[in-house]
Amino acid sequence: MPGKAHSHALRSGRFSAPGQIYMVTTRLSSGGRTFANWRLGRLVVNELRLVHEQDIAHSLAWVVMPDHLHWLFELRLGTLDRVLQRVKSRSAIAINRATGDTGRVWQTGYQDIAVRHDESLKNFARYIVAKPLRAGLVRTVRDYPLWDCKWL
């Protein structure tokens, strides 16, 4: 598969630090639109809220799009890989239970940006929250049910 041969090189430079803020994007494995079913998207939301409540990662903004997740958060405990593994595996189990499927839900890996302290978190949050608008899914952000932002 193209791109797989050097995927370890992307991970080798990844740095996890408690207190660091990350913007992460992760996609569905099938390329499908599983989260167009908002009930299934809520299962991902439940996991984001759980890691927040357990002080593992403090969510600043997120949006569950039909085929991917954007998440801005502060890492509190563990590593970036472990937090993403937890959210993805627990949500995949819940989604497979809800649908009766047994297959893979998420792609392996994710894209991440370590946000510098001098960058505007609100600009990252605006970018995330406006994704459904830019994708033409809704006319106003209020019409899309699968997002949240600390500042709104």
Task: Tell me what each language-model feature is.
Residues M1-L152:
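Short catalytic/metal-binding and nucleic-acid-binding patches
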